[in-house]
Amino acid sequence: MSSSAIQVAKTATFLPDLVEVQRASFKWFLDKGLIEELESFSPITDYTGKLELHFIGSEYRLKRPRHDVEEAKRRDATFASQMYVTCRLVNKETGEIKEQEVFIGELPLMTERGTFIINGAERVIVNQIVRSPGVYFKDEMDKNGRRTYNASVIPNRGAWLKFETDKNDLLHVRVDKTRKINAHVLMRAMGLSDNDVLDKLRHPEFYKKSIDAANDEGISSEDQALLELYKKLRPGEPPSVSGGQQLLQTRFFDAKRYDLGRVGRYKINKKLRLTIPDTVRTLTHEDVLSTLDYLINLELDVGGASLDDIDHLGNRRVRSVGELLQNQVRVGLNRLERIIKERMTVGETDSLTPAQLVNPKPLVAAIKEFFGSSQLSQFMDQTNPLAELTHKRRISALGPGGLTRERAGFAVRDIHPSHYGRLCPIETPEGPNAGLINSLATHARVNEYGFIETPFWKVENGVVIKSGDPIYLSADREDEVRVAPGDVATEDNGEIKADLIPVRYRQDFEKVPPEQVDYVALSPVQVISVATSLIPFLEHDDANRALMGSNMQRQAVPLLRPERALVGTGLETQVARDSGMVPISRVNGTVVYVDANAIVVLDEDGQEHTHFLQKYQRSNQDTCLNQRPIVHQGDPVIVGQVLADGSACEGGEIALGQNVLIAYMPWEGYNYEDALLVSERLVTDDLYTSVHIEKYEIEARQTKLGPEEITREIPNVAEESLGNLDEMGIIRVGAFVESGDILVGKVTPKGESDQPPEEKLLRAIFGEKARDVRDNSLRVPGTERGRVVDVRIYTREQGDELPPGANMVVRVYVAQRRKIQVGDKMAGRHGNKGIISRILPREDMPYLPDGTPVDIVLNPLGVPSRMNVGQVFELLMGWAASNLDCRVKIIPFDEMHGAEKSQQTVTTFLTEAAKLSGKDWVYNPENPGKLVLRDGRTGLPFDQPVAVGYSHFLKLVHLVDDKIHARSTGPYSLVTQQPLGGKAQQGGQRLGEMEVWALEAYGAAYTLQELLTVKSDDMQGRNEALNAIVKGKPIPRPGTPESFKVLMRELQSLGLDIAVYTEEGKEVDLMQDVNPRRSTPSRPTYESLGVADYDED
């Protein structure tokens, strides 16, 4: 198939750098954020005021990291750099100054791809969206149905201040949700006189009631107000004027305790039309008075006062890596400050040096805690390049300082008009996180204040001006202007064609003539996220299915031989490039050397640049990361050119699946309810074969009885089982292993108690110690098999850091090729997913007029009710493209080129395909898009013509191999004694209450009894049953289930006198073993069967 691609829709398809969100934020942290924090803590003085310690933040240094990225991954280390900062210790009494560079901790560094390497694993810090600090005005209904208004001043950190009105037109204030205080009490406590307040208000008469109320309470002076304030905020403590003053000062006017942040100051200035400089981060009298004034205007409904919508993106901001890290550094420095103050007090003043005062531990711990266990620091989703890219662009409302799943209502999760071009309205998880985790839209960027902006072209007098850079607007700014969507039709000179244009203005839709349009969106794609923008004909899909399509593309497994989609949207190249999976040339030059491991480019100055390629490495999700060169020796290359394909890439484009021939028709019920019928060709030609790499690890520990040993000498193991082990007892690379094979031989010393009596006897007689060790080798688990691709040995001698108590760690990587099989999940890009129900020989599949058998048969009933018609357009466009031997790029939302454009385009392509290929059956105008198929089994044509074409189908990561599981006996839960659940725990299948009802309805009493007792949690019964089976005896009667005893104990613990009685009224002691003849064996005893055992029957 030739690789010519036809671009159908011409619009702005260039995208900004898609990982910029992460990189820019971390750069800000290194340039400004860290310095800000260090300087805000400087100087630290001791309690007597004799010593001062200054951090000179602007002079901090980062050392070169100890390991590079690859080395850090290999050694399970953190890719981090040591931070040093210059400290100056000033002795106020003697005037002595000591300056010294001090180590303050390790800072993990971001890799070029926007990720962090923590303990050898790649992690991503997800962006968090939180309520912006500032002032918010809301209305509430009281219980009498009267509307009251309130104003909240929310800082970045510190106490909340809330003003509210009541039914008597009095103004109250609450500090941090405590009891209500008359607002004028706060004004007086702040030292404002009645006139100071009244002069600042536009409607002072409303406020006078609050002054009268304060006077009635006998609070007429500043001192009385301070006492009253102290009483309300600290009830139960003896009030004092100085205490009140200090309380007020520290709560709102101390920069250490109260911080609006740059954003908060900006928002307050904007809302209240103030001009306070943004260096003033605490509350001012002006802020408080303006807030009161605005609230009174709201109450009286004058002065253009408006309420705030907290779900508007102008009131929510994004905290990216840099800021989250800065907050964490602040926590660490707070702890450090306490330690420094204590050391200053305790130590000898004269001999103290900065290095003795500064202990790096608190800061190291705070940063480690953030990267290791914060909700926002996540194990990177590396299933394929798209999953990786989407993870870095994710925006979560959860996490510290954010919402919780249970508390989040419908309004927060819902799509808001201000999301346009900022957050994707489609891509979000299904389930409890829906709407709380979003994805950044394709063209969106985060500005310096943390608000999301999106680009527009300016429109002047009905002409779109596309020269120069587009203009980025935040959600606030956008509300004030009239914005037309990105798919308005324009002439070549940029003039808008239509007479009336639908525009968005103040979150509403109206139609205006072109002259009144202020801006037009950059591209139709800017509304949606990266994953969604890869879906062709998206506009024909229902949003719920497009959501599934977006999410399932992220779960596509990289295949052995990826293939680009026949029908794409034009964004595939950039997704592959920005994901960081494909190596890109850094210079203009010529390729001088290429092999599977490295590509060398010679630049114009004669310097060599070597690009090392990843070969068969394991990803976080056990998929395979592999890069294949696509340039040849002697090729000229330019800056930014793709040199090699990564996993799930082909020709520098993202290629998540395969283009396969699909027919929509029922086939013998095998595609009922979303099942798929597939051809054997997908298996034999390795179309959907993928490589998975599993990691197995074992450590040799130091035990009380001596060290464990990694060795070839394993007791009671036949020599043939050791065939693939080397002299150390470790499997050789390249060996093929199956379930139960030994990967690493290990023996553990056995204690005295572990020995059976006969061995103790031999020991007593011969006095010689047989080598008492037991086999503790690492074996291949149940359903796995594959080829060993790598073995890594870590020891202390080599300088590796090992877990405490371990002498040696061995890791074995096993790769397996998985062909597609029944039970695997597949999906298209439109949310059309299914499970393979049968693999049919290709001679039995329905075939085309030229004898080509189809690859997959889908159920046509999956389309109408789900309303994802995009799949049908893709099918037919793919059919035309394959017959024209080309690939097609169609940007979504193509009606800017005319009404019903998709249908026209597809029809044009199909007629063209029929003409050029010389096969008139390719397109039949009588049955457009349908062909007459014949049944592969009989050769007879089917009754009706069938829709056939090429579609891009993915194999998803939910593979049946990882799910299939069986158990005979296995571990039991400690309390209930029932089998555990899940494959990882070797668990059983849950027999829930509905299954019990089914068996009850059937009357299967004995089956039910043994399911609830012997096969579950009747401890004695199950051991006796197993013994009976082994000895061939009849199975004894079941006893009491353990969970019944637990229930009895629980009821007794509530103080209920509850017991079980026989029919004769005798109490049964459940805790006593039913069969007193012998104690229950902990495991079945396989005694040799004597003659007596047979005679009894």
UniProtKB/Swiss-Prot annotation:
State the EC number(s). 2.7.7.6
GO terms for cellular component: DNA-directed RNA polymerase complex
- Spans annotated as Disordered: 1072-1097
**From which residue to which does the signal peptide run?**
none
Q: Which Pfam families match?
A: RNA_pol_Rpb2_1, RNA_pol_Rpb2_2, RNA_pol_Rpb2_3, RNA_pol_Rpb2_45, RNA_pol_Rpb2_6, RNA_pol_Rpb2_7
From which domain of life does this come?
Answer: Bacteria
InterPro entries found in the cross-reference section: DNA-dir_RNA_pol_bsu_ext_1_sf (IPR042107), DNA-dir_RNA_pol_bsu_external_1 (IPR019462), DNA-dir_RNA_pol_su2 (IPR015712), DNA-dir_RNAP_su2_dom (IPR007120), DNA-dir_RNAP_su2_hyb_sf (IPR037033), RNA_pol_bsu_bac (IPR010243), RNA_pol_bsu_CS (IPR007121), RNA_pol_bsu_protrusion (IPR007644)
Q: Does the keyword Transferase apply?
A: yes
Among SUPFAM superfamilies, the record links this protein to: beta and beta-prime subunits of DNA dependent RNA-polymerase
Family as reported in the entry's similarity comment: Belongs to the RNA polymerase beta chain family.
- PANTHER family in the record, alphabetically? DNA-DIRECTED RNA POLYMERASE I SUBUNIT 2
Q: How does it assemble?
A: In cyanobacteria the RNAP catalytic core is composed of 2 alpha, 1 beta, 1 beta', 1 gamma and 1 omega subunit. When a sigma factor is associated with the core the holoenzyme is formed, which can initiate transcription.
What name has this protein been given in UniProt?
A: DNA-directed RNA polymerase subunit beta
